[in-house]
């Protein structure tokens, strides 16, 4: 049987260039920072476009990865400018986008099919509203599941 599991990646939030540098100094393989206007960490994100470009260049020069987070549930007003706002970020060549909204994921897949997308821990789906297999957004990486399950563990059969 062939394993599809990759080696674990130590991923840390950047928030600032200083924090990014600390994360790498202490062993992080990758960092993430939010895209301005499209990230839930608006208050903890000092990354404007200039700092994103610098952070991506520094990370990749060290053989590290830099992911840009796009994890909002957008209002229609933000949808109108999303691809235009994303274009300069894509030109910076981040290693992947971390996304949560299925509609935005499908939009990126349609217009930027080669851009790697990792699924955010904020992503969710209501079972009866899941897209069909042919319309399902695809992601190249999935986060470990955050789950508190109501089932009691069962004892292994002896």
Residue ranges and their predicted role:
Residues 1-158:
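Non-catalytic helical/linker scaffolds that mediate oligomerization, partner binding
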């Amino acid at each position: 049987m062939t394993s599809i599991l990759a080696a674990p990646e130590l991923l840390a939030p950047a928030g600032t260039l200083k924090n990014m540098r600390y994360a790498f100094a202490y062993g992080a393989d990758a960092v993430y920072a939010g895209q301005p206007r499209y990230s839930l960490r608006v208050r903890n994100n000092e990354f404007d476009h200039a700092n994103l470009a610098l952070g991506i260049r520094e990370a990749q020069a060290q053989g590290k990865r830099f992911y840009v987070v796009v994890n909002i549930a957008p209002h229609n007003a933000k949808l109108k400018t999303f691809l235009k706002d994303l274009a300069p970020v894509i030109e910076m060549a981040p290693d992947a986008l971390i996304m949560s909204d299925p509609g935005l994921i499908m939009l990126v897949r349609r217009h930027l099919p080669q851009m790697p997308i990792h699924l955010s821990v904020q992503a969710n789906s209501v079972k009866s509203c899941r897209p069909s297999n042919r319309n399902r957004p695809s992601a190249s990486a999935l986060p470990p599941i955050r789950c508190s399950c109501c089932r009691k563990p069962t004892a292994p059969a002896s």
